[in-house]
Amino acid sequence: RICPRILMECKADSDCLAQCICQESGFCG
C-alpha cells in the first residue's frame, strides 16, 4: 500500500491520506 510519510492524527482510516490506516497510536501509518 502507498502511504505518504506525513505525521497525521486520526480517529479513523478515512482521516488518513492515500492508503494509510489509523494506527493504535492515534496516528496514520
Swiss-Prot record:
Protein name: Trypsin inhibitor 5
Primary localization: secreted
Cysteines paired by S-S bonds: C3-C20, C10-C22, C16-C28
Annotated organism of origin: Cyclanthera pedata
Notes concerning its domains: The presence of a 'disulfide through disulfide knot' structurally defines this protein as a knottin.
Origin superkingdom: Eukaryota
Key words of the record: Disulfide bond, Knottin, Protease inhibitor, Secreted, Serine protease inhibitor
Family membership: Belongs to the protease inhibitor I7 (squash-type serine protease inhibitor) family.
GO MF terms, alphabetically ordered: serine-type endopeptidase inhibitor activity
Localization per Swiss-Prot or TrEMBL: Secreted
Stated role: Strongly inhibits trypsin, weakly inhibits chymotrypsin.
One GO cellular component term: extracellular region
Site (Reactive bond): R5, I6
Matching InterPro entries: Prot_inh_squash, Proteinase_amylase_inhib_sf
